[in-house]
């Protein structure tokens, strides 16, 4: 049982919002609610808050319908937990620069969510919904894709396309399968086979021995590929950390929330990279 399910045994979804800053997004017709922490209002290390990252529960039963990643942090952000990471057995994957997408089965059909919505809204400046865009990335509608999937699993993906660009450009709509969760056991499960059977991409896998090797790699990538976002490392206990490229962070700060902030231009100008900046925006 998740901590949020235990919480809801004695409290309500309204309490989640008022006490922990958890945003609730209800489906317009089905008994589903998306739970997401608030970057500012939610206590970031609270166990309930950590679980509420695109999590979907059945409103009536509180059963898990969609299980995504728990919240995880940038390396160095929560120093008390850095020592828990097991560098004797860990994997590293590229961090793709798109939008979280969650593919799941409910009430007899396959569906797809973004982290904060049921993907039924029209994408900004486009004539199609988020779900329709995801189907373009998958190359088929969700029901056809679902033939190769297990209805007891949530498929955690990164949807990348020209329509939801953050910093890195993706010329075509693509779907990266990041991992999968069994919604009964809540355990993470292998997903390479599902990627092969659906045509979804997988992040690039790297082999490193320690954090220093990762940081050197990212410094090299920053020079070769400035929009490369970074990597996610995961140990055998399921602990995850993200480590981002310094140039990606600079470009992301420069872009801001779709508004350019002049103060973030200075490091690029001092480095003589002002011409290169123009190619990213």
Regions found by a protein language model. Give the residues of each.
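Core nucleotide-handling region used for phosphoryl-transfer chemistry
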Residues: 1-281
């Amino acid at each position: 049982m998740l901590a949020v399910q235990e919480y809801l045994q004695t409290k309500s979804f309204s309490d989640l919002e008022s006490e922990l800053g958890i945003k609730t997004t209800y489906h317009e017709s089905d008994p589903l609610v998306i739970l997401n922490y608030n970057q500012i209002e939610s206590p970031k290390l609270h166990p309930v808050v950590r679980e509420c990252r695109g999590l979907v529960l059945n409103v009536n039963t509180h059963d898990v319908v969609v299980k995504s990643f728990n919240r995880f942090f940038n390396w160095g952000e929560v120093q008390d937990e850095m020592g828990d990471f097991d560098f004797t057995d860990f994997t590293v994957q590229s961090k793709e620069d798109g939008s979280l997408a969650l593919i799941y089965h409910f009430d007899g059909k396959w569906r797809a969510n973004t982290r904060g919505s049921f993907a039924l809204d029209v994408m900004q400046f486009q004539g199609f919904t988020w779900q329709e865009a995801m189907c373009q990335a998958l190359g088929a509608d969700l029901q056809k894709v679902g033939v190769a999937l297990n209805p007891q699993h949530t498929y955690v993906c990164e949807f990348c396309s020209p329509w939801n660009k953050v910093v890195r450009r993706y010329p075509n709509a693509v779907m990266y399968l990041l991992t999968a969760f069994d919604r009964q056991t809540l355990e993470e499960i292998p997903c390479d086979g599902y990627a092969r059977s659906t045509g979804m991409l997988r992040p690039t896998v790297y082999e490193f021995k320690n954090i220093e090797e990762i940081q050197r790699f990212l410094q090299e990538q920053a020079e070769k590929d400035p929009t490369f976002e970074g990597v996610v490392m995961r140990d055998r206990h399921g602990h995850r950390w993200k480590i981002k490229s310094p140039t990606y962070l600079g470009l992301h700060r420069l872009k801001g929330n779709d508004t350019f902030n002049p103060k973030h231009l200075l490091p690029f100008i001092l480095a003589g990279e002002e011409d290169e900046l123009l190619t990213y925006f």
